[in-house]
């Protein structure tokens, strides 16, 4: 039995699809390289190009610029399309979560300028940008977020973890030190008494994980709260999963 010619069995993309895919690739490459002038040139030729990419592409242009840390490109995109900053990627992370996790402090500042409420935005597992900064040990980002949104210090995840819990769980001593210092200076002693889902305070976690420096830091501050003297319950679960990479 004769088979039809191969050419007839292949579905070729239309010229419109090819053009869209090409423009997507060009824009994403510009985002990776931070080529703002090239972006402006494309916009002069097609003022709707950013909207077209947002509608037709599964990837987010701003995410690409965020991950590579191109501040000028991020500034230009947020200036042109401020509503982009509230969009989530396919994994459920906001742009602020990604910037905080990667330690891009200038981008974090820029996003705060666009919308200060992004500091308290909850993502997967109710984690805020401060939670991700603590997990990754991004000290500069922690300082910026606390300065812009002090109430974030008491925000808890679905497992009732504060940023301090997460810093200790992930062995981020510098982040822990910065958080403890901020808590002390801002009279937020109650944070030391907050227990997670397993009823562990940060002191419980530090003792269980044998983090001597953290234990000494907490005891030296004398701000560990009465709940820290309850029996230790070493039932810490993993917490580094589901973090923007």
Please report, for each region that a protein language model flagged, where it lies by residue.
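Ankyrin-repeat boundary/linker signal
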Residues: 53-55, 88, 121-122, 155-156, ...
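Start-of-repeat signature of ankyrin repeats
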Residues: 23, 57-58, 92, 126, ...
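Membrane-proximal ectodomain caps of single-pass cell-surface receptors
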Residues: 151, 158-164, 169-245
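Ankyrin repeat domain, specifically the short helix-to-loop turn at the C-terminus of the second helix
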Residues: 43-48, 76-83, 109-118, 143-152, ...
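Conserved ankyrin/ankyrin-like repeat signature
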Residues: 38, 72-73, 106-107, 140-141, ...
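Internal amphipathic alpha-helical repeat/solenoid segments
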Residues: 6, 12, 16-21, 36-92
């Amino acid at each position: 039995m004769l088979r039809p010619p191969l050419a007839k069995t292949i579905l070729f993309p239309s010229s419109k699809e090819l053009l869209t895919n090409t423009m997507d690739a060009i824009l994403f490459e510009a985002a990776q390289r931070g080529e703002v002038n090239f972006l402006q040139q494309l916009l002069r030729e097609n003022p709707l190009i950013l909207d077209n990419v947002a509608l037709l592409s599964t990837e987010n242009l701003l995410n690409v610029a965020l991950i590579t840390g191109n501040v000028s490109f991020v500034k230009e995109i947020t200036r042109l399309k401020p509503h982009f900053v509230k969009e989530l990627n396919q994994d459920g992370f906001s742009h602020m979560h990604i910037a905080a996790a990667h330690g891009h402090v200038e981008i974090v500042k820029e996003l705060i300028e666009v919308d200060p409420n992004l500091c308290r935005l909850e993502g997967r597992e109710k984690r805020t940008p401060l939670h991700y900064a603590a997990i990754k040990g991004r000290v500069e980002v922690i300082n910026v977020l606390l300065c812009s949104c002090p109430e974030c210090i008491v925000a808890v995840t679905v497992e009732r973890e504060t940023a301090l819990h997460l810093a200790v769980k992930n062995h981020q001593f510098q982040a822990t030190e910065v958080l403890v210092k901020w808590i002390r200076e801002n009279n937020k002693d109650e944070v030391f008494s907050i227990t997670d889902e397993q009823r562990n305070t940060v002191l419980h976690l530090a003792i269980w994980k044998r983090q001597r420096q953290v234990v000494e830091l907490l005891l030296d501050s004398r701000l560990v709260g009465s709940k820290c003297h309850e029996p230790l319950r070493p039932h810490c679960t993993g917490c580094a999963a589901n973090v923007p990479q």
